[in-house]
Swiss-Prot record:
Principal subcellular localization: cytoplasm
This protein's GO CC annotations: cytoplasm
Keyword Cytoplasm: yes
InterPro entries: Aldolase_TIM, Transaldolase_AS
Protein name: Transaldolase
Organism domain of life: Eukaryota
EC number(s) recorded for this UniProt protein: 2.2.1.2
Function as written in the Swiss-Prot or TrEMBL entry: Transaldolase is important for the balance of metabolites in the pentose-phosphate pathway.
């Protein structure tokens, strides 16, 4: 889960934000 892998969760958010920047 998120609590078990905060680093992976953080990376997923960073990747999602990167995609959002491309579409805007």
């Amino acid at each position: 889960g998120v609590t078990s892998n905060p680093a992976i969760f953080q990376k997923a958010i960073s990747t999602s934000n990167a995609y959002n920047d491309q579409f805007r």
